[in-house]
Amino acid sequence: VPDKHIEELMLLTNNKEQISQATVINRDEKGEDSHQEKLENRNTLWYHIPEEEGNKLQVAISQMYARFCVPKYHCEFKNYEPAQFLGYPVGGHYIEHNDAETFDRGEWRRIADRDVSFLFYLNSEFGGGELEFPELGLTIKPKKGMMIAFPSYKEYVHKVHPVTWGHRYTLVSWVGTKQKLYDTIPKEGV
């Protein structure tokens, strides 16, 4: 993410009226979504992104998908979810999860039209807050300007370790593809 966009996004953290607790979405068997604040699962703040800035971000995300993901996964872009600007205060965390599926009644069920997850790190001035992929034995210390993209599926369960000092700022978005990535996921993973 260009520094100019990062600076514009960081200004949003000053508008306390546009901050809310991020929620967890649960989708039932009928496809109905419910949003729940489950602080034991996720302690994250959500910052409202104005429409104009959101549109710029979506163009940038589409370009990054074309540049970095199409050559690796060979899947055409179908749709995206608007970017979310998240803040993790001291103690902020997110338990193990994947971004598209849930295990319910003995089977995996798709709950979101997400195939590629994008994470963009907007600052480095915090402790803790590492991104971990437990099944892959991989832990990443985020740094300002870093982008991480990975399949949104159950094979890529991940979590965010609690922030120990400072405030971790992240931009997240998800892309849906015309063809599912299940058969195109590289053996080397992320």
Where are these regions (language model features)?
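Fe(II)/2-oxoglutarate oxygenase catalytic core
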Residues: 1-147, 155-190
